[in-house]
Design a protein with these regions (language model features):
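Catalytic-loop of the protein kinase fold
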Residues: 136-154
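C-lobe/activation-segment region of protein kinase-like
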Residues: 166-235, 241
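C-terminal single-pass membrane-anchor helix
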Residues: 273-335
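Short beta-strand micro-motifs within the conserved protein kinase catalytic domain, predominantly
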Residues: 82-98
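Conserved short submotifs of the Hanks-type protein kinase catalytic core
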Residues: 93-109
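Activation segment signature within eukaryotic-like protein kinase domains
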Residues: 125-126
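Terminal C-lobe "cap" of eukaryotic-type protein kinase domains
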Residues: 249-273
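ATP-binding glycine-rich loop module of kinase domains
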Residues: 5-7, 26, 30-31, 37-67
Length: 335
């Protein structure tokens, strides 16, 4: 859910009871969900069931994330992030700990889901993500720290959800949080200015990560050439190659543009190989001295050819129907 390269800000065991200073709501820690530079998230049980509670010793960080969630909640359509439930302080042994409580989104992280269900789901889910990013960008925000750990797949019906808004930044400011593998500055030296193209670079790297679950380290200067070679070395990525490269090179004007490009790749992702007709074998033409032709023999031969032609047309028709059903299935998953 969050970066775990920094030191834990807190380490409370399961069973710890948190009582809000102002609103007096009580939460019991069930387990740790993840932590990062700006706080730690616990699964807690409150009066309304299981929820996620993020705490920090920085009131600025908590306030910033609360403002993001409040902003997201005002956007029409499918929720862009977890629903905000409570904001309060907790006094623990003379220390004031700031926290907020949000909806606990149950599901599987994106990487694990694709590994379990198959890479064919990657394009469908990333297209959903791009729809959400388009809405986020139109509200003046950039997600910033986009990576599979911050993306949960719920359902069925399967739907991708963002679960950690800690890196979300107002458009035009410096990115607050990032993870190197998905960072434009790390790979190509691009700026870490919060703008849609920064998120789209990360989306391209997420697709690469789905094909390389263990990721890989930067070699030498770690320029675009290394990324091109990585894309070209995986058959799963070839149908998305143009979309990924355009995202990495900053050629898309919006998340919507990348989504259109991605869907074009999906529509041609599984061409059905039609059976190749067998080469005709030339047979010696019988002469009158060997075999005398008869009307019944000619009729049977023509019927055989007609049957072969009929079978071929049936095969073509079946292939067309299967292709149409696949396209309808893909677009149905995107709705």
């Amino acid at each position: 859910m969050m970066n775990n390269t920094s030191k834990k800000p807190f380490d409370f065991p399961p069973g710890t009871v948190i009582r809000g200073k102002w609103y007096k709501h009580i939460y019991t820690i069930v387990k740790e969900l993840g932590y990062g530079a700006n706080g730690i998230v616990y699964l807690v049980q409150g009066s309304s069931g299981y929820q996620a509670l993020k705490m920090s010793d920085s009131n600025v960080s908590i306030t910033s994330e609360v403002n993001v969630l409040k902003s997201f909640s005002k956007v029409q359509g499918a929720p862009l992030g977890p629903k905000l439930l409570d904001v309060d302080d907790w006094e623990y042994r003379g220390q004031k700990i700031h926290y907020y409580v949000m909806e606990y989104i149950q599901g599987t992280d994106l990487l694990s889901f694709v590994q379990s269900k198959g890479f064919s789901w990657a394009g469908v889910l990333i297209a959903q993500l791009l729809t959400d990013l388009e809405r986020i960008h139109k509200e003046g925000w950039v997600f910033g720290d986009l990576k599979p750990e911050n993306l949960i797949v719920t359902g069925p019906p399967y739907r991708i959800r963002c679960i950690d808004v800690g890196g979300t930044t107002i458009n035009g400011r410096a990115i607050k949080e990032f993870t190197e593998f998905f960072d434009r500055g790390y790979w190509v030296g691009g700026s870490r200015r919060a703008e849609p193209s920064y998120d789209l670079f990360s989306v391209g790297m997420i697709l690469i990560n789905l094909a390389y679950p263990g990721r890989f380290t930067k070699s030498g200067n770690g320029n675009m050439q290394q990324l091109r070679e990585a894309i070209g070395s995986k058959d799963q990525l070839k149908k998305f190659e143009g979309s990924i490269l355009d995202a990495l090179e900053g050629k898309f004007q919006s998340a919507s543009d990348m989504r259109v490009s991605l869907l074009n790749g999906l529509s041609h992702s599984q061409p059905v190989q039609q059976p190749k007709p067998k080469p005709k074998v030339k047979r010696p033409v019988p002469t009158n001295s060997h075999v005398s032709s008869s009307p019944s023999h000619t009729s049977r031969y023509q019927n055989h050819r007609n049957k072969k032609s009929s079978h071929f047309l049936e095969t073509v028709l079946v292939v067309m129907i299967v292709s149409l059903l696949y396209v309808l299935y893909i677009y149905g998953e995107l709705m």
